[in-house]
Every structure is written in structure tokens, then in C-alpha cells.
């Protein structure tokens, strides 16, 4: 059984240190409060409700270990380089609006280098309030933070001041090659990433439901089975195909762009196409929607040259150059989320990690697909992959975070949030960060599972938190973007 890594938590006490009528909030013990951030210059006064705060326990504070509940999702700023989400390398990042219902996390993103030019020596946490709802995961490139709130907004990472916002509605966004690429559905446009100036805009033959950008190429998926590739600098159409899968036209299940290759699921086959020309490199049979149990095919190109695929209850290890099948693993239940890959030998925790919808976590040998161990958790409906970092595997199921030792497969701890966990956890510098539908951001000690700090916002957390250069960025349904010290929450540095 998993020991409980944290105490039962309830709503935090009233904000401390703010005079009546002041909309700033302060964590108990913090030197300075967080203000509401710069407001939109539209002449309207938006009421800002102070958030509640809960003091993080002292490191030495003992906590009772509770049994698991039966089934019912960095250093200081300017410190060591932060790795990408799920321990991946840096690169361009993407965020896409939900199609309806609960705001899900956006597609997997990877972080740019954390060095922020021009950051002042004395940095303060901040928050920025939007007029409209936020969705997805924030994106940081150089000294700007990009978020979508009906438009694309670019905020200065040091001060929280808005640099620019788009005049067009943007349901999806990708930042790459010095440009912000976005779509309002029937059209696609690009802006300068620094100044927001329009570079090009064009009409698309279909409704864009997914958008990714990399190495000068923009890849879109349109409703009705269309896939298009565009020149990032000019908007010229590079190639287009029809007949892609139409059962799962959602941002997370759309065509995937990775390292110069476009991966498309069509006619029961997984196609690997040259991203610039559309020429087929290889194809591999994975089955249509009925054959894979009514679940989308999930693809994870990996650093070892393989492409790992979850198709129904199967996990496939394919050769990245030829598409030849290296191995196949079958489980009793279907996989809803992509595989996760950790580089290195299995004896050091390397391999492929997957979790099925029953909540069983599998550690597979990347060379032959043999399962080294399997650990049951809770039934999960999350589309987010497990997270592997620093020899530990973190997986969310419902309102709980489970952490497992990657090598032996032994249960380390279970931490329960107040409601369903949103997005995926982020593990950086010995800490695990995640958001929840209980309106809270949580930061735990990654090894012990004890609560480092917790922030209650005015709404559900949306998407996956982002950690760059020791700063944690997150969005909430209270229409605020938060920039917090990853180690201390609202602690002051400088």
C-alpha cells in the first residue's frame, strides 16, 4: 500500500497582512504580498477576490501516515537549468484550447532554456488578471510568457506586465522560430514573438483543432480528416492530405510534429511523413478506432531513436527510421495516455512507462518490451502520461498523486488533493508541482511526498504548471496567471 505523503487539507485561512479593500494577498510569513498585476487598459474595473492561503508545514513537522483511499488527475529564480515537462529536453511549446467541458491540459510541452535576459536581481512573485477565461498551459520563451485567453497575451516574466496581445481570437497557439502561430478555427496567422506584429494570415479549408510548430514548419489538423503543413515564415502551404482519423479530433489526439517528422493516424496505419515535403517515410499497422477499443492512438518519439505507441491495450516499440516493430506488449486494459520514456539502462531506471485506465503502472524494458514491474493504483481517466524524473515515477489518478521508485517498482507515497488533479505533475529540482480542481497549486518534496507549500486561487487550475528558471507559472479559472517562486511559493528573493 502507498503511505499518505501529506495531511488532509481544507480551505486555507483568510488572507493575512492586507488592509480592508486591498486586493493583494500574502502568504503567512512572506515579506511582501502579491498584487493583482497589471490590468487590461479597457477602462473597466474588475473586482479581484483575494485568494486564501495555507502555510506550508515546516520541514521538521511530522505527519501521520494514512492508508490509501479506495478508487472513487527548481532552485531560486535564475538558478539551475530546468528540464522540460516530463524530464524532456527544451524546445518549442504548444497550447490548445479545450473543445468543451472541463478544461484539460494541453498537449505535451517542452521548456526553453531557463535563462531570462534582463531579469532584475530582486524578483517578486506576481499575478496578472485577464478579462476572460484562461485555458491550457503557459508557454515561456526567452523573457516572455504566452497564455491564451480568447487572444494570445505576452507577459514580461520579470514584472508580469503585458507586452502585447493579439487582436484576433486564438483558440490554439504554438510558439517557435521567433513567431507566435495561432488559429481562431477557420484561419491561421503568425505574429512576431517579441512585438506581436502580424507576419501573415490565411484562410484554412476546415476548422483547425490542433496546431504544432517546429523547425520552420507549422502542422495543423482540421476537422474532417485533414492534415496540412505550412511554411512558418510565410504561411505558404507545403503539403496537405485527407483521410486522417476523424474519431478523435481533439488537440491531444491530432497529428504530431517531432524532429522533422509528422506522425498521422489514418486508415488503421500510423504514418511517418517528412514534415517539409509530406513524403511517406514509413507506415505501421495499428488498427482503426474499433480495433483499438475506441481509444486514440498515442505516439511518443524518443531520444533512443525509437517511436513508442499506445494503441488500445498494446504498447509497440517501433524503429524510428523504418517503422519496423521491435517489440509488442499487451496489457489487460487499454491505455488512454501516451507512453513516457526515460533514457538510460533499465538498471538505472531507464525504459518505457505506461499506465492503463485501471490505474496499473507498467515499467517496460525499452530494448525488448518485457515488463520489469507493474504497480496498481486507482482507476484513471487521465490522458496525461506518467512523469519520470530523478529515479521516481509520478502518476495521477483522480485526486491522488502516486510516486513509485523507478528501479524496484516499490510504492513510495500517495498524496491526496481536495479534488481531481488537472494536467500532469511537473518534477523539477527535487519538487513535484501540480494543480487541482480544488482551486489549489501544490508543491511536494519529490522524495518524501510532504507538502512544501500550497496556494489556493479563486478557481480551478487549468492545464499543467510550467517551471522555468526556478519560477512556477500556472493559470487558474479565476482568470489570473500566477508566477511564483517554485521553492517557496510567494517567498521573496533578492
Give the positions of each predicted feature.
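Low-complexity, proline/glycine-enriched flexible segments
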Residues: 1-116
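Extended, low-complexity, intrinsically disordered tandem-repeat tracts enriched
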Residues: 3-18, 27, 34-35, 40, ...
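Compositionally biased regions
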Residues: 5-11, 15, 42, 61, ...
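Short cationic/low-complexity microdomains
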Residues: 65, 98, 447-464
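Aromatic (tryptophan-biased) beta-strands that constitute blades/sheets of beta-rich domains
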Residues: 97-134, 151, 159-167, 198-204, ...
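Repeat-blade elements of multi-bladed beta-propeller folds
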Residues: 131-152, 166-189, 202-228, 241-271, ...
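Short, surface-exposed beta-strand-loop junctions and turns on beta-sheet-rich folds
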Residues: 153-154, 161, 189, 279, ...
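Short loop/turn segments that connect beta-strands within beta-propeller blades
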Residues: 156-159, 192-196, 231-235, 274-278, ...
Amino acid at each position: 500500500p502507498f503511505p499518505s505523503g501529506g495531511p488532509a487539507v481544507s480551505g486555507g485561512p483568510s488572507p493575512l497582512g492586507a488592509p480592508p479593500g486591498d486586493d493583494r494577498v500574502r502568504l503567512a510569513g512572506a515579506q511582501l504580498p502579491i498584487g493583482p498585476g497589471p490590468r487590461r487598459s479597457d477602462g473597466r474595473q474588475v473586482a479581484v477576490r483575494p485568494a486564501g492561503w495555507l502555510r506550508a508545514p515546516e520541514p521538521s513537522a511530522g505527519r501521520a501516515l494514512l492508508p490509501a483511499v479506495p478508487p472513487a488527475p527548481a532552485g531560486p529564480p535564475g538558478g539551475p537549468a530546468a528540464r522540460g515537462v516530463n524530464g524532456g529536453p527544451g524546445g518549442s511549446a504548444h497550447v490548445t484550447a479545450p473543445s468543451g467541458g472541463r478544461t484539460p491540459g494541453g498537449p505535451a510541452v517542452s521548456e526553453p532554456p531557463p535563462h531570462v535576459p534582463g531579469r532584475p536581481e530582486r524578483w517578486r512573485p506576481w499575478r496578472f488578471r485577464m478579462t476572460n477565461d484562461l485555458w491550457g498551459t503557459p508557454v515561456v520563451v526567452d523573457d516572455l510568457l504566452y497564455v491564451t485567453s480568447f487572444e494570445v497575451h505576452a507577459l514580461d516574466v520579470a514584472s508580469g506586465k503585458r507586452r502585447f496581445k493579439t487582436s484576433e481570437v486564438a483558440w490554439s497557439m504554438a510558439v517557435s522560430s521567433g513567431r507566435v502561430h495561432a488559429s481562431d478555427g477557420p484561419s491561421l496567422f503568425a505574429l512576431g514573438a517579441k512585438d506581436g506584429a502580424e507576419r501573415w494570415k490565411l484562410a484554412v479549408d476546415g476548422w483547425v483543432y490542433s496546431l504544432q510548430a517546429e523547425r520552420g514548419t507549422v502542422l495543423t489538423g482540421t476537422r474532417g480528416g485533414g492534415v496540412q503543413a505550412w511554411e512558418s515564415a510565410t504561411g505558404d502551404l507545403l503539403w496537405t492530405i485527407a483521410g486522417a482519423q476523424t474519431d478523435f479530433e481533439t488537440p491531444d489526439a491530432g497529428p504530431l510534429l517531432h524532429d522533422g517528422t509528422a506522425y498521422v493516424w489514418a486508415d488503421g496505419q500510423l504514418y511517418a511523413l517528412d514534415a517539409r515535403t509530406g513524403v511517406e517515410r514509413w507506415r505501421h499497422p495499428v488498427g482503426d478506432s474499433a480495433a483499438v477499443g475506441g481509444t486514440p492512438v498515442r505516439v511518443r518519439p524518443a531520444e533512443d531513436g525509437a517511436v513508442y505507441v499506445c494503441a488500445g491495450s498494446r504498447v509497440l516499440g517501433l524503429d524510428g527510421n523504418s517503422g519496423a516493430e521491435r517489440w509488442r506488449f499487451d496489457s489487460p486494459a487499454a491505455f488512454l495516455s501516451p507512453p513516457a520514456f526515460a533514457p538510460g539502462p533499465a538498471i538505472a531506471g531507464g525504459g518505457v512507462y505506461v499506465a492503463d485506465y485501471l490505474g496499473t503502472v507498467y515499467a517496460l524494458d525499452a530494448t525488448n518490451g518485457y515488463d520489469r514491474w507493474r504497480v496498481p493504483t486507482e482507476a484513471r481517466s487521465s490522458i496525461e502520461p506518467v512523469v519520470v524524473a530523478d529515479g521516481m515515477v509520478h502518476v495521477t489518478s483522480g485526486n491522488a498523486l502516486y510516486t513509485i521508485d523507478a528501479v524496484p517498482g516499490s510504492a513510495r507515497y500517495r498524496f491526496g488533493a481536495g479534488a481531481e488533479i488537472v494536467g500532469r505533475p511537473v518534477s523539477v529540482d527535487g519538487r513535484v508541482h501540480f494543480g487541482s480542481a480544488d482551486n489549489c497549486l501544490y508543491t511536494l518534496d519529490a522524495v518524501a511526498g510532504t507538502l512544501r507549500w500550497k496556494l489556493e486561487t479563486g478557481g480551478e487550475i487549468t492545464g499543467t504548471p510550467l517551471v522555468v528558471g526556478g519560477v512556477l507559472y500556472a493559470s487558474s479559472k479565476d482568470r489570473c496567471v500566477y508566477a511564483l517562486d517554485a521553492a517557496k511559493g510567494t517567498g521573496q528573493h533578492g
